[in-house]
């Protein structure tokens, strides 16, 4: 079944079939296992792992700390590193997914380094923000290319 990540988010979804299709057919996740009787699936894309489960009102195992209203997942985004962000962006556009942040190149400082990414943010069917990014490498904060 492969290695399981040490941190995995479980996303409550309003339409399990639609969400499963989005994550597998549009974003390229593969299903590691499922529990059809619970409308649950454990998904993986190159080590990025998530669980999706159908939300049912009154389910005592939903672990909801407050009122659940759409869009779900407000206040956070999930960053998923991919090898070909352009192809994934094209897949999302072709599917008609809502792009929240257009494709951009962004450099983030980490101490004396800048880490570059090409990224965009898409909303899943329930409004969870997914930041899909591809590494552009590193460079010195001074702008000088790093040796190596």
Describe the function of each predicted region.
Residues 12-15:
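Conserved beta-strand-loop-alpha-helix junction that forms the acyl-donor binding cleft
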Residues 1-8, 30-83, 89-123, 133-148:
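Vicinal oxygen chelate
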Residues 19, 23-24, 92, 127:
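Conserved active-site tyrosine of GNAT-family acetyltransferases
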């Amino acid at each position: 079944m492969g290695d399981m990540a040490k941190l995995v988010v479980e996303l409550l979804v309003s339409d399990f079939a639609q969400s499963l299709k989005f994550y597998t057919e549009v974003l390229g996740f593969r299903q590691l296992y499922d529990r059809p009787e619970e409308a649950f699936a454990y998904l993986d894309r190159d080590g990025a792992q998530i669980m999706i489960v159908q939300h049912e009102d009154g389910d005592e195992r939903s672990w909801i700390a407050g009122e659940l209203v759409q869009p779900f997942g407000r206040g956070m985004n999930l960053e998923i590193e991919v090898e070909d962000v352009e192809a994934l962006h094209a897949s999302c556009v072709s599917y008609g997914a809502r792009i929240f942040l257009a494709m951009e190149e962004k450099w983030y400082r980490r101490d004396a380094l800048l880490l570059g990414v090409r990224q965009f943010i898409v909303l899943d069917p329930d409004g969870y923000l997914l930041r899909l990014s591809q590494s552009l490498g590193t460079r010195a904060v001074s702008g000088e290319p790093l040796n190596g």
